[in-house]
């Protein structure tokens, strides 16, 4: 895992906006040598440096640097009598007081519960949906800053440009009262002032959210009937402990991240300081949203209310959705931008053509190391993962076998009766599979680590290391799924449906059990995200790579997350069933898992990585720092006892020769869904009343683009038509059909009257999507550009705009010359359609859907690769032709971005191709249309360059030659020569 990085765009680990610790960057000395004695002048210079180090400098997107003044936290500003109060503070306190009075004056307990449930859900929706939408729009289009600039609310009224002088003076007084030091309302950038106003809105929502939750807890609170004093005391002690822990998490998090990250400051501007992780951020991922909500469950425990518990779970889930949909995409875009591509000069004269008879399994290309010679001589590796529902492939024997066995297990568990005999056999079956998964798999890995037993077996029969690896993955995957399928079947057999959900702790046990199962699923997904397919299947037991150990993802906090969290679902099943048999299976699973880690994984890791293995993870380090000296000494003694015990067990097992091993793994379930969707524009579809003032003859649209290849233009005459239609049609006039390359940028030139609306816009549509030429009745889905800058509330609509309102003299269709406004824009990337078809551009009036002009229809077509154009059947000629045809298509699919699009067939793709799947999906669609071969998107990412992809296409065409669409390859269908 990479270390802390600068906030200006270097790679760091995404931990959530509330997970960024900001520490000042220390300026370096010019001379590099400290003086031995300081005079008066030196002391003055040092004091000045110290003062400058205390200042924080911000940087806006346009490069403006400013001093970020110190601010105080929300609670102190509102509740501390020593802090100055302004109108916004009084307003927030008044709203909070209304909540408290409402609780006091509502007549009945049921009305208080219902009212405050609705009020809390309203404020929670305002937080997660309202603030989330504002931040999403600000992140993608800088919408809030655009609103501020369009309204001119931060412009001094003395300039005559601010139509709201009262609002200006109010905001000036409000903000300068709150920030008395190092702040000037007039001099601060618009981004910073916008953030300060946004903070006041956030203060209102957060305070009301917290207050309404506490009042809802008071309304729901009570003591269960028949509860003893001991249970009451335990419930309150546990609840208070969780609340105090929650309070410590919030305070420590605010100490670490300060107000800048607490209020999502980097959605507006960045600060020139280092970002590090400290305190609570070493304990858990996203602590503000994970352990930072422990207080919800503590309050629910003290209130003894299931209503409060269910709403707490709902609010917590909404907060995770906010993290996944809003914060994580922004952090990935802002801080984890792909690094610049390393360009390597390739000597093409020394590259030898590759023999097509070389086995694909003979070598594997390292995705992170690039060499021109290696790319030319090594074949690309396969990319066909096993884990995850999206990777299920029923053509693969492993997947089909696993699916059939799962169906069999489910049928046996459901259709057989739950008698003691069947229960015994299901529990025995689960125990045997667990023993095999631990002892059997552990023995294989141990022998593989010591003497490459598994690999040697396949080499003995002439197979490669890659074949051994693929077979091992299938064996391990089958064993893992069978282990958990048998455990689930045994749990199902031992489970009895509750007759009364309200009796005792039945409902609570089910809630806690389901939570533990969800925790194990999340842990497994996090482990897979950190390790990948290679690490999940213990790839370092099979491949000798240069040892490089990194701790990322969940491994930043825990050394072996599968030891505890990876088995949480097993103990969740124990809580749900409450049977001795499931407790036995859980104990067996946990014991064998620990033995597997200590006896198989740990020795291999020590042998492979040696001293680079860390002793303590982030969570352990944080806990050790919090322990008093006496407990630290006790912890050291316990560690020594555990180490001695483990050493004794290892010696005993080594003498007995059985090898116990287990690793608890589970299916991966991806809970992240990042939606980056540009806002569709206006949906109102009525004629504007002021259209009569505009002459539609003054509006026009003309297009320029890269013409498609000749094969695409001549494919209309393919021999399938009637005899008269097999030749190209005669055209009268000088205009030819517009047919552009797939993915190539299209330049749009427009004209409009001099008084046209500044909110006019041009959208791209399929011709068949609109039946009317006067009104557009379908959204553009982000494929639109405004004709003028600063006319809409998002910067997204300005991407591609080149020029606007350039006055030219134009001859209209009726021959009359007239001065009109003109402009140019380029549609590229996400503003294009990534499919084949016939399209048109539409010019719309005043931000509405009234159509003023429509462009000529144009076609996007991918020409099929013509094998007949290559003379002979030499592999080198075919491959070179494929490379030549493929390179411009791949460049278009990668938006012609020099950071990711290759300039030569040997050059590696940029790293953004691996992060964003849309690029590889564009390429596989184009390959399918050009060559009739369908690849998975993972293949494009695995190949890494055009040369490897061309080799794969050649190989696929060779394998599928009898079924080729070309007339020269086989005669499975009648050709023209055979037709009678």
Swiss-Prot record:
Swiss-Prot/TrEMBL GO biological process terms: methylation; phosphatidylcholine biosynthetic process
Pathway(s) the chain acts in: Phospholipid metabolism; phosphatidylcholine biosynthesis
GO cellular component, as recorded: cortical endoplasmic reticulum; endoplasmic reticulum membrane; perinuclear endoplasmic reticulum
The keyword Methyltransferase belongs to this UniProt entry's keyword annotation: yes
Chain positions covered by the region annotation Disordered: 1-64, 339-360, 705-733
Transmembrane segments: 87-107, 115-135, 201-221, 229-249, 283-303, 306-326, 400-419, 424-446, 476-495, 501-521, 567-587
Membrane-topology annotation of the record: Multi-pass membrane protein
Lumenal side: 1-86, 136-200, 250-282, 327-399, 447-475, 522-566
Source taxon at top rank: Eukaryota
The reaction(s) this protein catalyses: a 1,2-diacyl-sn-glycero-3-phosphoethanolamine + S-adenosyl-L-methionine = a 1,2-diacyl-sn-glycero-3-phospho-N-methylethanolamine + S-adenosyl-L-homocysteine + H(+)
Cytoplasmic side stretches: 108-114, 222-228, 304-305, 420-423, 496-500, 588-980
Record EC number: 2.1.1.17
PROSITE patterns xrefs: SAM_CHO2
Principal place of residence: endoplasmic reticulum
Compositionally biased intervals (Basic and acidic residues): 40-56, 344-355, 717-733
InterPro entries reported for this sequence: Phopholipid_MeTrfase (IPR007318), Phosphatid-EA_MeTrfase_fun (IPR016219)
Keyword field: Endoplasmic reticulum, Lipid biosynthesis, Lipid metabolism, Membrane, Methyltransferase, Phospholipid biosynthesis, Phospholipid metabolism, S-adenosyl-L-methionine, Transferase, Transmembrane, Transmembrane helix
Molecular functions (GO terms): phosphatidylethanolamine N-methyltransferase activity
UniProt subcellular location: Endoplasmic reticulum membrane
Record's function text: Catalyzes the first step of the methylation pathway of phosphatidylcholine biosynthesis, the SAM-dependent methylation of phosphatidylethanolamine (PE) to phosphatidylmonomethylethanolamine (PMME).
Family, per entry: Belongs to the class VI-like SAM-binding methyltransferase superfamily. CHO2 family.
Annotated protein name in UniProt: Phosphatidylethanolamine N-methyltransferase
Species in which this protein is naturally found: Paracoccidioides brasiliensis (strain Pb18)
């Amino acid at each position: 895992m990479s270390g802390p990085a600068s906030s200006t765009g270097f790679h760091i680990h995404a931990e959530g906006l509330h997970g960024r610790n900001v520490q000042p960057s220390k300026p370096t000395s010019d001379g590099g040598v400290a003086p031995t004695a300081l005079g008066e002048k030196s002391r003055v210079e040092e004091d000045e440096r110290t003062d400058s180090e205390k200042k924080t400098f911000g940087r806006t997107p346009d490069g403006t640097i400013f001093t970020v003044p110190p601010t105080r936290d929300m609670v102190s500003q509102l509740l501390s009598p020593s802090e100055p109060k302004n109108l916004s503070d009084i307003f927030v306190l008044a709203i909070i007081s209304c909540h408290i009075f409402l609780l006091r004056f509502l007549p009945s307990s049921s009305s208080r519960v219902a009212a405050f449930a609705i009020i809390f859900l309203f404020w929670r929706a305002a937080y997660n949906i309202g603030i989330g939408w504002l931040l999403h729009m600000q992140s993608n289009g800088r919408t809030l800053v655009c609103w501020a600039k369009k309204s001119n609310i931060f412009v001094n009224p003395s300039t005559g440009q601010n139509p709201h002088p009262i609002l200006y003076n109010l905001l000036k007084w409000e903000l300068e009262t709150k920030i008395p030091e190092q702040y000037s309302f007039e001099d601060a950038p618009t981004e910073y002032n916008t953030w300060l106003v946004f903070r006041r809105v956030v203060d209102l929502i957060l305070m009301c959210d917290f207050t309404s939750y506490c009042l809802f807890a008071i309304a729901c609170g009570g003591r269960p009937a028949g509860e003893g004093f001991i249970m009451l005391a335990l419930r309150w002690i546990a609840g208070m402990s969780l609340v105090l822990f929650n309070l410590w998490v919030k305070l420590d998090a605010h100490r670490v991240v300060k107000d800048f990250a607490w209020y999502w400051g980097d959605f507006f501007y960045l600060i020139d300081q280092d970002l590090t992780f400290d305190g609570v951020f070493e304990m858990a991922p996203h602590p503000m949203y994970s352990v930072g909500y422990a207080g919800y469950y503590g309050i629910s425990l003290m209130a003894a209310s299931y209503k409060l518990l269910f709403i707490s779970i709902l609010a917590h889930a909404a907060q995770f959705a906010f993290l996944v949909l809003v914060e994580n995409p922004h952090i990935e875009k802002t801080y984890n931008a792909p690094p610049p591509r390393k360009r390597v000069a390739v000597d093409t004269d020394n590259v030898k053509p590759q023999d097509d008879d070389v086995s694909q399994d003979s070598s594997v290309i390292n995705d992170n190391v690039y060499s021109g010679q290696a790319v030319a001589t090594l074949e690309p590796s396969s990319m066909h993962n096993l884990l995850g529902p999206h990777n299920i492939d029923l053509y693969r024997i492993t997947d089909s076998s696993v699916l059939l066995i799962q169906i069999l297990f489910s049928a046996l568990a459901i259709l057989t009766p739950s008698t003691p005999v069947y229960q015994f056999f299901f529990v025995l079956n689960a125990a045997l599979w667990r023993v095999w998964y631990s002892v059997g798999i552990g023995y294989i890995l141990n022998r593989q680590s010591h003497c490459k037993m598994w690999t040697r077996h396949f080499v003995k029969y002439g197979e490669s290391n890659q074949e051994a690896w693929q077979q091992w993955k299938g064996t391990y995957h089958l064993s893992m799924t069978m282990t958990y399928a048998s455990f689930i079947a045994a749990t199902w057999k031992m489970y009895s449906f509750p007759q009364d959900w309200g009796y005792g702790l039945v409902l609570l046990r089910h809630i806690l059990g389901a939570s533990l199962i969800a925790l194990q699923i999340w842990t497994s997904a996090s482990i897979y995200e950190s390790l990948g397919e290679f690490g999940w299947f213990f790839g370092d037991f099979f491949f000798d790579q240069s040892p490089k150990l990194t701790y990322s993802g969940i491994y930043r906090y825990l050394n072996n997350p599968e030891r505890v969290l990876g088995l949480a679902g097993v103990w969740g099943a124990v809580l749900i069933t409450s049977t001795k048999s499931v407790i036995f299976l859980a104990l067996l699973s946990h014991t064998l898992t620990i033995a597997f880690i200590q006896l198989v994984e740990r020795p291999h890791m020590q042998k492979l990585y040696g001293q680079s293995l860390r002793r303590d993870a982030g969570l352990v380090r944080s806990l050790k720092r919090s322990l008093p000296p006496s407990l630290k000494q006790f912890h050291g003694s316990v560690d020594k006892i555990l180490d001695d015990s483990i050493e004794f067990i290892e010696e005993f097992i080594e003498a007995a020769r059985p090898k116990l091993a287990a690793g608890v793994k589970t299916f991966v379930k991806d809970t992240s869904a990042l939606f980056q969707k540009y806002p569709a524009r206006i949906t109102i579809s009525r004629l504007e009343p002021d259209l009569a003032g505009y002459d539609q003859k003054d509006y026009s649209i003309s297009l320029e683009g890269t013409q498609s290849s000749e094969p695409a233009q001549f494919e209309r005459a393919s021999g399938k038509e009637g005899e008269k239609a097999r030749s190209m049609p005669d055209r009268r006039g000088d205009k030819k059909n517009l047919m552009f390359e797939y993915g190539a940028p299209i330049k749009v030139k427009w004209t409009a009257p001099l008084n046209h609306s500044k909110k006019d816009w041009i959208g791209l549509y399929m011709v068949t999507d609109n039946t009317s030429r006067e009104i557009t009745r379908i959204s553009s889905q982000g494929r639109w550009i405004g004709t003028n800058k600063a006319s809409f509330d998002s910067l997204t609509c300005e991407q591609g705009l080149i020029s606007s309102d350039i006055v030219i003299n134009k001859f209209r269709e009726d021959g009359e010359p007239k001065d009109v406004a003109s402009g140019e824009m380029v549609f590229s990337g996400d503003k294009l359609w990534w499919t084949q078809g016939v399209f048109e551009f539409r010019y719309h009036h005043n931000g509405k859907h009234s159509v003023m002009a429509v462009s000529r229809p144009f076609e996007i077509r991918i020409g099929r690769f013509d094998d007949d154009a290559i003379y002979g059947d030499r592999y080198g000629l075919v491959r070179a032709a494929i490379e030549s045809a493929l390179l411009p298509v791949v460049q278009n699919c990668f938006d012609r971005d020099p950071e990711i699009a290759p300039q030569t067939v040997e050059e590696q793709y940029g790293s953004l191709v691996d992060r964003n799947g849309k690029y590889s999906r564009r390429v596989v669609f184009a390959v399918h249309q050009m060559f009739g071969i369908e690849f998975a998107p993972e293949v494009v990412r695995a190949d890494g360059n055009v040369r490897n992809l061309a080799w794969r296409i050649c190989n696929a065409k060779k394998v599928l030659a009898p079924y080729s669409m070309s007339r020269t390859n086989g005669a499975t269908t009648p050709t023209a020569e055979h037709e009678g």
